[in-house]
Amino acid sequence: MANPFSRWFLSERPPNCHVADLETSLDPHQTLLKVQKYKPALSDWVHYIFLGSIMLFVFITNPAPWIFKILFYCFLGTLFIIPATSQFFFNALPILTWVALYFTSSYFPDDRRPPITVKVLPAVETILYGDNLSDILATSTNSFLDILAWLPYGLFHFGAPFVVAAILFVFGPPTVLQGYAFAFGYMNLFGVIMQNVFPAAPPWYKILYGLQSANYDMHGSPGGLARIDKLLGINMYTTAFSNSSVIFGAFPSLHSGCATMEALFFCYCFPKLKPLFIAYVCWLWWSTMYLTHHYFVDLMAGSVLSYVIFQYTKYTHLPIVDTSLFCRWSYTSIEKYDISKSDPLAADSNDIESVPLSNLELDFDLNMTDEPSVSPSLFDGSTSVSRSSATSITSLGVKRA
């Protein structure tokens, strides 16, 4: 009798198909052989050099003891070289790089950081949308709305990436999880870089300090999440946000970026549920403004960043989804997008411009001077009758016979 896993997930698996199989070997020699045969493209060189440079920067900048940093990097190297673990952790390199840079950001010297902007975001918000949407949404608060905003912002945001990864791994096509790790990691990595290059105060700062200048010695604030701490009798969010690694990281909103990226991947793999995923993103947008953690312009920037990275990932990394298949073990092959075929401006053999002139039928054009005109003309004498309207003939001064 088949076990539940085989009955549910392997029943559609084609015989002798190993597309969805996982690597179970613990022999590092196999990884070394793959590396020797690997021929990286230009994009691969850029990818690894960029991430490697940031990891080296973190290694030098982070104030942790050198022995701990060396041991940590050796541990990562071990995970990368063992086949059973490298298939997950090696593809998660953008995520690991983002996490390393994020937790190192608080140790950057203040004299080398750019000044914190306090007035730009509320000014842009007013110019684009006519008012400060965060202030409007946060004007009226109650316990029900607090809980409703806390769920996506304070709970789902931290657990959703793992849930989405698990669902994509089981019900998406093989290798889709690699694309998700690539896109999710790069979106957050670019977001943290932008937050460090362009530090901006969130709405809660304006509520507490007005428009006075900010400095890096200030502590963060949980904003509306302080009401959740009070409601639940805890001090979790107050402590976490007061000591955040990137206190002035309002722009772009990585809460919005993460929710948008998760929704984009779910819409890609499960298009029938697209309204549900869009509703989740809108729910999180509202919660971030209600809890005074972001302006609407921050949310738009985070979503645009996610969309751009997703589109690049879609055409360079993601497999094509077959919505008629149940799970990863139902696939018989992995197909990816061909950018040249998807380009609407690319030359096509079916285009009329691509057909040689020798293959065109030119009999009509060649015989135009030898045969009388089929269409009546004004200058064919009394036998010609114009096919245009009577008004146009009259305007030429020609009377009908």
Curated annotation (Swiss-Prot):
Residues 1-41, 86-87, 177-178, 267-268, 313-401 are cytoplasmic. It catalyses: an N-(2R-hydroxy-very-long-chain fatty acyl)-(R)-4-hydroxysphingoid base + a 1,2-diacyl-sn-glycero-3-phospho-(1D-myo-inositol) = a 1D-myo-inositol-1-phospho-N-[(R)-2-hydroxy-very-long-chain fatty acyl]-(R)-4-hydroxysphingoid base + a 1,2-diacyl-sn-glycerol. The lineage of its organism: Eukaryota, Fungi, Dikarya, Ascomycota, Saccharomycotina. It is a multi-pass membrane protein. This is Inositol phosphorylceramide synthase catalytic subunit AUR1. Inhibited by aureobasidin A (AbA), khafrefungin and rustmicin. Changing residue 137 to F: AbA resistant. Changing residue 158 to Y: In AUR1-1; AbA resistant. Present with 4170 molecules/cell in log phase SD medium. Component of the inositol phosphorylceramide synthase complex composed of at least AUR1 and KEI1. Catalytic component of the inositol phosphorylceramide synthase which catalyzes the addition of a phosphorylinositol group onto ceramide to form inositol phosphorylceramide, an essential step in sphingolipid biosynthesis. Its EC number is 2.7.1.227. It is an enzyme of class 2 (transferase). Residues 63-64, 109-155, 200-245, 290-291 are lumenal. Changing residue 157 to Y: AbA resistant.
